[in-house]
From Swiss-Prot:
Induction: Methylation at position A1935 within the 3'UTR of ZAP1 mRNA is regulated by both the MTA1 methyltransferase and zhe ALKBH demethylase, and controls its stability and subsequent translation. The keyword Metal-binding applies. Residues 207-230, 240-250, 259-281 have a biased composition (Polar residues). Transcription factor that plays an important role in C.parasitica development and virulence. PROSITE patterns: ZINC_FINGER_C2H2_1, ZINC_FINGER_C2H2_2. InterPro entries: Znf_C2H2_sf (IPR036236), Znf_C2H2_type (IPR013087). Pfam families: zf-C2H2 (PF00096). Residues 1-58, 191-350, 363-388 are annotated as: Disordered. This is C2H2-type transcription factor ZAP1. It comes from Cryphonectria parasitica (strain ATCC 38755 / EP155). One of its GO terms (molecular function) is RNA polymerase II cis-regulatory region sequence-specific DNA binding.
């Protein structure tokens, strides 16, 4: 028995006590013999305590008030609540000339601080002291900006930090909360209809008038007249000019039967036509261009005129201008044109030619003119007069 104990519980020799000791494994013996393993529950590391589940159901309120039906989880809470209905206030203030009664002892404790002036609760933001914790919590809303008490009237919606302030504010309202809610709903409905109507695009006054064909508006491409080429328009203009000046001995600017050739008539006729001016005019549109005030070379002149000039009416020069030139003729300058024989149009006698060009002109000198051939062109000098 003793040998078995020594084997189970060995001790080192005195000489080996001074040597470094080897710490054996918990489950190993000195000779390498393994002991039965220990239960893991004995040396397992401690587990952290679990926090209570937030979704856990609160304790059932088994104690209900017989007067108002309010439930409580503890009997003591129910007994304190019943004092509200019975009017029992067992806690009385012993301060002289006070005698106030309270249902709870905590309420009496807070009341006594009114007499003593004690304010143990202090604000950590501004350092203001308070006698109770509820007053300090109400004061903290000033710094945090929380206003939990809201006016129930829909047309007001003001918020307050204290319930008493909200109650005092509600006394100024007239009517019920339901009436205020209905009035607010009607106002919101009218505002939504007005916003939707203003968001719709409306036609401007210019768009409404444009349907009547205003002369100052730009017509659509379907209403515009087809534009002709510049060469065709100029050819038509030249033809009209030749037609106006035909069979007349007066130039175009002195004739009274051609009212359309004047600039004023041209300007007025351009705006009185049915073609409306556009931002992209196609030459002159359907109206003819303004005619040139110079006499045309195609005009047929009489035998006693020199290109229709009133100053050369006495010259007996038969002008061949009654024959149209090939460049401006209707045939377009074809090869069938034949120039007239000069013998039939001009006199062959040189003296007659000189008389035709100069004799008539000598009689047309202006009085006081210094041109050659004038009778008063030569004036004697002063020294010649003395010599004479």
């Amino acid at each position: 028995m003793s040998g078995h104990l020594q084997a189970a519980r060995p001790y080192g020799s005195p000489t080996s006590m001074h040597a470094s000791l080897h710490m054996p494994e918990p489950n190993m013996g000195p000779s390498g013999m393994a002991f039965p393993s220990m239960a893991p529950e004995l040396y397992a590391p401690p587990q952290p305590l679990r926090a209570p589940d937030a979704t856990s159901q609160p304790a059932p309120k088994a104690y209900a008030c017989s007067t108002c039906g309010k439930g409580f989880a503890r009997r003591s809470d129910l007994a304190r609540h019943e004092r509200i209905h019975t009017g029992v206030r067992p806690h009385v203030c012993e301060y002289p000339n006070c005698g106030k009664q309270f249902i709870q002892r905590s309420a009496l404790t807070v009341h006594q601080r009114v007499h003593t002036g004690e304010k143990p609760h202090m604000c950590e933001r501004c350092g203001k002291p308070f006698s109770d914790s509820s007053s300090l919590a109400r004061h903290r809303r000033i710094h945090s900006g929380k206003r939990p008490y809201k006016c129930p009237y829909a047309d007001c919606q003001k918020t307050f930090t204290r319930r008493t302030t909200l109650t005092r504010h509600q006394n100024h309202h007239t009517g019920t909360v339901e009436d205020a809610a209905r009035a607010t709903a009607e106002v919101l409905a009218r505002n939504s209809v007005a916003r939707s109507a203003s968001a719709r695009p409306t036609r401007s006054e210019g768009d409404q008038i444009s349907n009547h064909g205003s002369p100052l508006s730009t017509p659509s491409p379907a209403q515009r007249t087809m534009s002709m080429s510049p060469s065709a328009e100029l050819a038509a203009a030249n033809g009209m000019q030749h037609q106006y000046n035909g069979n007349s001995s007066l130039p175009a600017h002195m004739r009274t039967d051609l009212h359309s050739s004047s600039p004023a008539a041209t300007t007025s006729s351009g705006f009185s036509s049915n073609v409306r001016p556009t931002s992209h005019p196609n030459a002159y549109g359907a109206a003819p261009p303004p005619t040139t005030l110079e006499p045309s070379i195609e005009g047929s002149q009489g035998p006693g005129s020199a290109v229709g000039s009133p100053h050369m009416s006495s010259v007996g020069w038969a002008s061949p201008s009654h024959v149209a030139s090939p460049a401006h003729s209707n045939s377009g300058g074809n090869s069938s044109y034949v120039y007239p024989d000069p013998d039939s149009s001009y006199p062959t006698n040189a003296a007659a030619q000189g008389q035709m060009f100069y004799s008539a002109a000598m009689g047309l000198q202006r009085p006081g003119s210094a041109e050659p051939g004038a009778q008063s062109a030569y004036k004697p000098r002063q020294n010649e007069l003395w010599a004479a």
